[in-house]
Amino acid sequence: MKVLVSPMSVAEAIEAIEGGADIIDVKNPAEGSLGANFPWVIREISELAKKYGKEISATTGDMPYKPGTASLAALGAAVAGADYIKVGLYGVKNAEEAYEMMVGVVRAVKDFDSSKKVVAAGYGDYYRISSVSPLDLPEAVAKAGADIVMVDTAIKDGTSLFDHMKIGDIESFVKLARDNGLMVALAGNISWNHIETLKELSPDIIGVRSIVCEGDRSSMIKRELVVKLMEAVHG
């Protein structure tokens, strides 16, 4: 189980890298759950992380249902140096729209560099934003050629993934992903009391920010908290 940590700046990226995070995820929480950062920020953090042998992911935003816009944004993240390109399917209402979004994104990214991984991200609190259910995503995004399916939370109000999806539904999501040949990632205000449950669910990747910040998700990432998390996950 790899740990993905989401810094907002180069200074935070250094904390995450030196704390031992597996994947450095470049996002901009000021623009939403999967808010996009600027290409030059992605590039700078990518160049830094690669020196330490770390992989980089980058979010393209909580996207409306606009496949062309999503494809262009995804290519931008790929060109800027991201190994994983993560697309938030915020405005997507059903499996058919998810397929249409992701097939364009996959082509844009893979035509540029076939080694890069495409991540389709749904939301555990989908019912609060009138979005597609995560359980409808694995088959559709696998058919589109995505590599990873993820679930996060859209509204960052202190509630977690586990407040919005039953354990059985998360288990089903993980199984559907694996049955469709996808890697699977779980995120959404993960806290210390979720770690053992996550080990049992055994996703390929967990995504965090709040748990490794000195205060809430808008405060600074601290390397000692990243170290503590890595020990908890792999201990």
UniProtKB/Swiss-Prot annotation:
Q: What class of enzyme is it?
A: lyase
- Which EC number(s) are documented for this chain? 4.2.3.153
Coiled coil (UniProt feature): none
Task: Look up the domain of life of the source.
Answer: Archaea
What residues form the catalytic site here?
K27, K86
Q: Which UniProt keywords apply?
A: Lyase, Schiff base
* Swiss-Prot/TrEMBL catalytic activity: 2 D-glyceraldehyde 3-phosphate = 4-(hydroxymethyl)-2-furancarboxaldehyde phosphate + phosphate + 2 H2O
GO BP term, pick one: methanofuran biosynthetic process
**MF GO annotations:** carbon-carbon lyase activity
Give, as in the UniProt entry, the pathway in which the protein acts.
Cofactor biosynthesis; methanofuran biosynthesis
One Pfam family in the UniProt entry: 4HFCP_synth
Give the protein's biological function.
Catalyzes the formation of 4-(hydroxymethyl)-2-furancarboxaldehyde phosphate (4-HFC-P) from two molecules of glyceraldehyde-3-P (GA-3-P).
Q: Which family does it belong to?
A: Belongs to the MfnB family.
* Name listed for the protein in its UniProt record: (5-formylfuran-3-yl)methyl phosphate synthase
Q: Which organism is it from?
A: Archaeoglobus fulgidus (strain ATCC 49558 / DSM 4304 / JCM 9628 / NBRC 100126 / VC-16)
Q: Lineage, please?
A: Archaea, Methanobacteriati, Methanobacteriota, Archaeoglobi, Archaeoglobales
Gene coding for it: mfnB
